[in-house]
């Protein structure tokens, strides 16, 4: 017996697929608009009206996807985190040598401060880090844990511990955030000094 999908179900599926694509595009526009507004103002608390205006959408579209502005900010954080994790994974995956992997990871983090475009995009989060941690402690802890997964295996391969990886991660991110907050672009010598310091710390702990 041939399994024929009723016409109403096929039409409903087609409509849902079309709306899914439309809604995904709207969410992308809202996230990009929020990034744009925050980069322009340096504030992590933009007005909804400014976001929807930049996105070319309506308040109705905004609240169709996000229950609140905080929900959008979490999506913005998650999106930026995903991009950074993908970037660091690609860097670490370009070599099989664990020391080179740790070096590349640290250089990749500091590159966010050395690149003017990346620094401008990250600056609102760098200067409001304490406020974000107070507002979204669980979400920020989860993003930090995800970042650690891109570094910890390489540190362990050098004989270090997960705590060592956490120290390296915290130090690299602190240096990045400090540079971004003060609109300072770390010089190559500073980056390499930080790399040498972190590698020495990992080896000292073994």
Regions found by a protein language model. Give the residues of each.
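Short secondary-structure transition hinges
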Residues: 110-152, 159, 180-181
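Helix-turn-helix
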Residues: 29, 37-71, 75
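Alpha-helical DNA-contacting segments of helix-turn-helix folds
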Residues: 73-80, 143
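Amphipathic alpha-helical interaction segments
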Residues: 29, 50, 71, 100-108, ...
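A short, Lys/Arg-enriched amphipathic alpha-helix from helix-turn-helix/homeodomain DNA-binding modules
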Residues: 24-36, 87
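N-terminal intrinsically disordered/low-complexity leader segments
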Residues: 1-25, 206
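Hydrophobic alpha-helical bundle segments that form small-molecule/ligand-binding pockets
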Residues: 93-95, 141-172, 179-183, 202-206
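Hydrophobic alpha-helical connector segments
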Residues: 75, 89-115, 168
């Amino acid at each position: 017996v041939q399994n024929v999908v009723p016409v109403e179900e096929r039409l409903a599926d087609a409509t849902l697929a079309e709306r899914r694509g439309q809604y995904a595009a709207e969410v992308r526009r809202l996230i990009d608009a929020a990034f744009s507004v925050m980069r322009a103002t340096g504030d992590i608390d933009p007005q909804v009206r400014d976001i929807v205006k930049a996105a070319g959408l309506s308040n109705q579209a905004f609240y169709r996807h996000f229950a609140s502005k905080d929900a959008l900010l979490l999506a913005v954080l998650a999106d930026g985190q995903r991009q950074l994790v993908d970037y660091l994974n690609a860097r670490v995956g370009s070599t099989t040598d664990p020391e080179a992997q740790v070096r590349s990871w640290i250089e990749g983090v500091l590159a966010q401060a050395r690149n003017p475009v990346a620094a401008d995009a990250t600056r609102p989060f760098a200067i409001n880090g304490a406020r974000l941690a107070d507002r979204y402690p669980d979400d920020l802890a989860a993003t930090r844990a995800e970042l650690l997964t891109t570094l910890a295996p390489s540190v362990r391969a050098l004989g270090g511990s997960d705590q060592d990886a956490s120290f390296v991660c915290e130090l690299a991110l602190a240096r990045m955030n400090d540079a971004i907050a003060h609109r300072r672009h770390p010089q190559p010598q500073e980056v390499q000094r930080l790399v040498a310091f972190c590698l020495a710390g990992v080896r000292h702990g073994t």
